[in-house]
Amino acid sequence: MVGALELVTSIAGLIAFVETLLGFASELRSLSSDCSSLVDELAVLNRVLNEVDREFRESINLCTAEARATTLDVLEGCILQCKATCEELRDVINRIRRSKAKKVRARLEAGKIREGLKRLERDKSTLRLMMATIT
């Protein structure tokens, strides 16, 4: 289990990572509706992560030691899961960006993009639930 400071650092790192992904994905928005949806979902994830970061910083010291330990443990798992999803999407985005036939590559990667979108939705829901628990 990590401490509060390490978790704050992990959240900040994930926010920076998502912002970078968002920039790369924005270059691909016009290739397909899946790429456009990916940009939208990454933007929402970025907002959710910023909200979680703010709520976590404001309220983590207000809860009991037991509640704090549970919150740290569960939120760490959520952040790691979200990071794994983003890493997989980064790989897909990079394959499309490096392709000479971006539109064709985007179509070939459509299934992976859709799967990533489903995972992002699940990750965001989990983070929102966690945020509701924190407050």
Model-identified regions with their sequence ranges:
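N-terminal amphipathic alpha-helical segments
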Residues: 1-70, 74, 89, 96, ...
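Elongated alpha-helical scaffolds
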Residues: 77-91
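A generic alpha-helix preference that emphasizes hydrophobic side chains
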Residues: 5, 79, 116-117
